[in-house]
Amino acid sequence: MVRLLTYNVHRCVGTDRRLDVGRVAEVIAAQSPDIVALQEVDVGRARTGGVDQAHRIAQRLGMAFHFNAAFTVEEERFGDAILTTLPERLVKAGPLPGHPRFPQLEPRGALWVEIETAAGVLSVINTHLGLVPREQRLQAVALAGTEWVGAAAPGAPLVLVGDMNATPRNAAYRILAARMSEARRAAPFSHRAPTFPSTFPVLAIDHVFASEAVVVDAVRTPLDPLSRLASDHLPLIVDLSLGARTPA
């Protein structure tokens, strides 16, 4: 079994508006994940004290990491990271398309890392989709297409994870769910596992989509006081096994 945790850390600013990288790392450590996918990570930004949050969290967890800047302003970067205790290899990092009619929107990107588990190699693609539905659709199509999910070897174990800013009613979610199985629905027992807002979670907008070669064993979100405080999202924890799913 492999435990994966995806978490929008809101630049490590909690619902109390306090910046605290340490408590974000504490929330993650409490779940003992093998693989961590983070969104909204600040690296060298003045607003969060110039700290490399990806490095700082990875250091506290004893993990290796890869970071992809969705956008860069001079020396300041903001984006997504994948951390793991397992052997890993960066496959690809790059931008996702924006909507041409909304050039002012925040740029988005994706990060692909191959991770060696005891059962074989697992590809993990981490992303954070935009807020505007038309932009989300373009990004979901790109992720499902030949440059990302479609570039993996046929039948290879792969998960696409992150803050999709989309519920099952959204077009972006449906595009991705048509290509892969969403973890909440693929788990043996169906779970709503809402992740936003952390203080009173009602929306499931953080997701894990799994290929046919990945079995979802369990899905959950922690509801302890620290998890509700450390970020405006809750982490989503998914236990996975590598191997083809048994048809229902």
What does each model-identified segment do?
Residues 51-54, 80:
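Generic internal hydrophobic packing segments that stabilize the cores of diverse globular domains
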